[in-house]
């Protein structure tokens, strides 16, 4: 077994607060696969049950906010997480419950993936919840990982270029978050540009675009990968770099399932030594 793989196989724990995806490609299912494949231990608090497949979302069944709080605190009081990944938060009541639970468990490494629209176009959060996320939750997390449409919604700013991405990331910093990773897959071009920004640094990660429709759950996967690397003690920027490499490999080896936007291959990380090259 490669030495670098041994380094990753720590006893770190990642708590995932997100919605369930019945197709298995995104949401809490993708998160668990990612954390487990990268060698850490996944804990969960489910915020909603979504009925969906690769062609779209059929319905969303919300979980009682009180039970979301109980899931987070009861699990964390027994097994303390080293990092938290937050995904789908569809209402103000859910966000308030999550904020209350985060105040209770006091974990530093919190990654927020502001899930707003499913790959097929279905809206996954209401407008009041977006405003609460911007005004309160964003200040409590270590980093946020929006894609371009999500970053546009959060800042009321259109993104057409890499420079626009940087400016929008800086606007998000002004909202109170310390680190921003904007995913650039929605911009056209031979390469995908993911941009990391904090108060002192700007880093552009360039990846050759994989021509495929099978990208369901890439955002969930990236944020969970970043949270996992953070849980192992890696710096934020390095965690972003390794997370992007992991997702890129998972897209390249996708199994081509389903009639729509198919899932990626989370277990490609069994060849995880490639990520460190």
Q: Where on the chain are the PLM-derived regions?
A:
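Phosphate-handling active-site elements
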Residues: 38-43, 203, 229-243
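Conserved phosphate/ATP/ADP-binding segment of small-molecule kinases
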Residues: 127-202
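Short, small-residue alpha-helix embedded
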Residues: 29-34, 153, 212-236
């Amino acid at each position: 077994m490669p030495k670098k793989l041994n380094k990753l196989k720590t006893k770190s724990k990642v708590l995932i607060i997100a919605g369930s995806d019945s197709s298995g490609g995104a949401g809490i299912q993708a998160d668990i696969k990612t954390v487990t494949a990268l060698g850490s231990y996944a804990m969960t608090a489910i915020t909603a049950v979504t009925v969906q497949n690769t062609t779209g979302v059929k319905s969303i069944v919300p979980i009682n906010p009180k039970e979301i709080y109980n899931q987070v605190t009861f699990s964390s009081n027994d097994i303390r997480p080293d990092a938290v990944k937050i995904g789908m938060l569809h209402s103000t009541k859910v966000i308030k419950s999550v904020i209350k639970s985060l105040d209770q468990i006091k974990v530093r490494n919190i990654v927020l993936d502001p899930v707003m629209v499913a790959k097929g176009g279905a809206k996954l959060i209401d407008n009041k919840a977006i405003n609460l996320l911007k005004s309160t939750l964003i200040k409590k997390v270590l980093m946020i990982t929006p894609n371009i449409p999500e970053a546009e919604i959060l800042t009321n700013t259109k993104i057409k270029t890499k420079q626009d991405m940087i400016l929008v990331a800086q606007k998000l910093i002004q909202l109170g978050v310390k680190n921003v990773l904007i995913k650039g897959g929605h911009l056209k071009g031979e390469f995908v540009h993911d941009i990391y920004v904090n108060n002192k640094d700007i880093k552009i990660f360039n990846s050759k675009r994989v021509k495929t429709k099978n990208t369901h759950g890439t955002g969930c996967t990236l944020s969970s990968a970043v949270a996992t690397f953070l849980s192992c003690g890696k710096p934020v920027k390095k965690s972003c770099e390794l997370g992007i490499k992991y997702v890129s490999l998972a897209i390249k080896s996708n199994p081509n399932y389903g009639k729509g936007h198919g899932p990626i291959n989370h277990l490609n990380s069994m060849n995880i030594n490639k990520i460190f090259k």
